[in-house]
């Protein structure tokens, strides 16, 4: 792909669906078989989006750097949070619910940082697709729709996490009311 050549990043085919991602520590783009071998506008848009992340990395886009630094921490903390939540529900321990609330709040904040990263990568993808003449007129509109739909998944995930956070707060408040 021409976009790859511009960013001097290696691209590999990997197994799975919806597993496409840019790995900033290894400076490589992993694309699922359908995207890697695809010729559809959707395949081009997804591949270009991942190239957008590589460009963010190369240009030191601040939200990308923050997000990349937070990924390992959030992954570990999220695991602990759900484990703590399970213990609190089974054992009725409100201390673990409070811990889970704090951890879920950290997850929500991480998702807030992720949104501008994903939106910016999609914008960069569209610029690359246009500059390299990989899409024309209606194809450009289709690529925008694909990338907008992808962004909506991040928004939906954020809203879901916010609702989970509110649910935990309500559980904690109801347990505190029961103790009064």
Where are these regions (language model features)?
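Short juxtamembrane and helix-loop transition motifs at transmembrane-helix boundaries
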Residues: 58-68
């Amino acid at each position: 792909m021409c976009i790859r050549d511009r960013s001097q990043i290696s691209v590999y085919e990997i197994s799975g669906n919806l597993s496409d991602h840019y790995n900033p520590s290894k400076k490589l783009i992993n694309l699922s078989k359908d995207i890697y071998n695809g010729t559809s506008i959707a395949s081009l848009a997804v591949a270009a989006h991942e190239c957008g992340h590589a460009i963010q990395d190369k240009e030191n886009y601040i939200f990308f750097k923050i997000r990349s630094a937070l990924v390992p921490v959030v992954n570990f903390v999220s695991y602990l949070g759900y484990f703590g939540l399970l213990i609190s529900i089974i054992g009725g321990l409100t201390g673990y619910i409070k811990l889970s609330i704090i951890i879920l709040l950290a997850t929500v904040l991480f998702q807030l940082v992720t949104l501008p990263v994903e939106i910016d990568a999609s914008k960069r993808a569209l610029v690359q697709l246009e500059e390299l003449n990989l899409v024309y007129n209606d194809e450009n509109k289709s690529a925008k729709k694909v990338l907008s739909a992808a962004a909506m998944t991040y928004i939906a995930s954020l809203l879901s996490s916010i609702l989970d956070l509110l649910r935990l707060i309500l559980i904690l408040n109801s347990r505190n009311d029961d103790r009064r």
